[in-house]
Swiss-Prot record:
Residues 115-141 are annotated as: Disordered. It comes from Enterobacteria phage T4. GO terms for molecular function: endonuclease activity. The keyword Hydrolase applies. Residues 122-141 have a biased composition (Polar residues). This is Probable mobile endonuclease E. Keywords: Endonuclease, Hydrolase, Nuclease. SMART domains: HNHc. The keyword Hydrolase applies. It comes from the Viruses.
Amino acid sequence: MNYQKIYNDLISRAQAREPLSEYKETHHIIPRCMGGSDDKENLVELTAREHFIAHAILSKIYPVKSVIFAFFMMCNMKGTKKRHYKVHSKIYAHAKKLNSQFRKGTVISEETRLKMSKSENRSAFNRRNQTQNIGGNQRKG
């Protein structure tokens, strides 16, 4: 399958159409991690679905850590950012597996470990809520 052609066609369609009036996301045509810039010529407005598909295709064309991580993060959105699309379990599993392969063997410095331990996700409020919610919806009886 020619993923580069599919990606180019997706971007060309988005560039040729009228500006979107619905929810839209800005996408770097050439990812910044691969030398792309924030110039107008390198940006395109995509629907949420198109944006997800674009990152899925990019992860097939360029199986490098930063591109895989961007796709994985789109599959794994949590918190205040609401996902405007549904992620199929097979796609999520694929993204998770690729991300895991690239992270394997990564050494985390002591400085980074300290930053992670002090992060907001480990605040007393969050720890208390996590503890209270561990049981989830348990069956009664």
